[in-house]
Structures are given as structure tokens and as C-alpha cells.
Amino acid sequence: MTLSKITSIAGLLASASLVAGHGFVSGIVADGKYYGGYLVNQYPYMSNPPDTIAWSTTATDLGFVDGTGYQSPDIICHRDAKNGKLTATVAAGSQIEFQWTTWPESHHGPLITYLAPCNGDCATVDKTTLKFVKIAAQGLIDGSNPPGVWADDEMIANNNTATVTIPASYAPGNYVLRHEIIALHSAGNLNGAQNYPQCFNIQITGGGSAQGSGTAGTSLYKNTDPGIKFDIYSDLSGGYPIPGPALFNA
């Protein structure tokens, strides 16, 4: 085998290793019940994949949406996302666990979670009509030593699990739950931030009457937002501005 072929194979293996390191949500636990997610590393290759609460996506490379796609529907629930067919039931005020398959330690960044009312059946809602309210967000935890300790680091340490509380005051109904990691390891450059959105259909029970006004998925971020174009290797003493609309506060 020639040296050039060996080098080429080594490069491909390195690229495959990097891609394999990116994760996705394999399932959630809501009110103590487990619901399987959309297994993007398996289901796209099946002739009859199972129905799930998760929205399907064509991101079989376990890739991301960057700033060039922020005005595209791909940013809403990932690339070419299609509605989940099932629904998880969760009581207002209770917790949901998002179980990520894995996550690269180098891909530091925030975890952000949104809710959007479907105003009907989430299995048929047009994703471009959804209006998202930010219900949970965690970013920089410790910036004393760049690149710092981030929400994703805490998630990794917690067995690749992130936990979010559904606001107790939230109105009952059908919602799309949008959960994402934004990887900032290349975000010092324009369009360097990497978004990994994941969507799930849930039905909230109990609760109150709050909902929030919401923001269209294609308007959540701009590629020049301070929390999107952000150098994690610089001085972090000034903190980190989590991107997107304001956090819900009932």
C-alpha cells in the first residue's frame, strides 16, 4: 500500500472518529417513564422504523446546523426534521431527563430548552408555525480557566444526562419540546458555532395558564449574536451571554 493511500485512510478514520464523537438524544425520561428517541444512527436505514415521540432528522453524520442555517427550517428541529408520531405525558412542575448518547469533551457550550404549543396535534403541526419559549438554559459554569467549565461538561459528568423542569405554571396542552447543545469550540469565527437541536412531542398535564409569547425557530438566533460568535479561549471573566430570547419567568 502506498504512503498516499495510508495517509488518506488515516484521514478518513480521523474524520469518522470526530463525527462518531457527536451525540444525539437517544431517549427521555418524563414523570419516571422512559420514551425512546429517534435513533438517527439506525432508523434512517430501516424500511419500517418505529414511531417515536422524537422528530426524525436526516443528520446521519451526527452533524450540526451552523449560522448559515439559522433562517432555515433546519434550525428548528435539525436537518429535514419530520414530526414525531407519538407523545410523552408530563405533569407541569415535574422533570424531564434527556439522555444523550455521548458528547465530545472539547465541544463546550450551553444547553438550552424550549417549549412551543402545537395548538392541536404535534404529529401534524407545521414546524415553521411553532413559537418557542425558552424554559431552561445553562451556559458557562466556571470561566476561571479558559476554555472553562460549561453546561455540557456537567451533562457529561452526569452520565450524559441533562435534566430540565417543566414550569409548574405552564398551561396544559400539546407542545414541541426543543432541547439543544450549542458547541462553541470554533465559535470565535463567524458561523463557527454548532447547533444540535432535538425535538420531542409532549403533553403537559395540570399546571396553570402561562405560556409565553414565543419566537419562531428561524428567529431564535443570528450568527452575530454575542453568545453565538464567542471565543471560549479568551478571557471569560465577563461571563457568557446565553443566546436566544429571554428565559421564561412566570
From Swiss-Prot:
Any one biological process term the GO annotation gives: cellulose catabolic process
Inducing stimuli: Expression is highly induced in complex biomass like sugarcane bagasse (SEB), Avicel(R) PH-101, and CM-cellulose.
Pfam family, one: AA9
pH dependence: Optimum pH is 8.0.
Modification Methylhistidine, positions: 22
Disulfide bonds: 77-199, 118-122
Classification via CDD domains: LPMO_AA9
Gene Ontology CC: extracellular region
Co-factor note (free text): Binds 1 copper ion per subunit.
EC number(s) from the headed UniProt entry: 1.14.99.56
Free-text biotechnology note from the record: Lignocellulose is the most abundant polymeric composite on Earth and is a recalcitrant but promising renewable substrate for industrial biotechnology applications. Together with cellobiose dehydrogenases (CDHs) an enzymatic system capable of oxidative cellulose cleavage is formed, which increases the efficiency of cellulases and put LPMOs at focus of biofuel research.
InterPro entries assigned: AA9, AA9_LPMO
MF-aspect GO terms: monooxygenase activity
Signal peptide coordinates: 1-21
Recorded family membership: Belongs to the polysaccharide monooxygenase AA9 family.
Name of the protein in question: AA9 family lytic polysaccharide monooxygenase B
Organism of derivation: Aspergillus fumigatus (strain ATCC MYA-4609 / CBS 101355 / FGSC A1100 / Af293)
Source species taxonomy: Eukaryota, Fungi, Dikarya, Ascomycota, Pezizomycotina
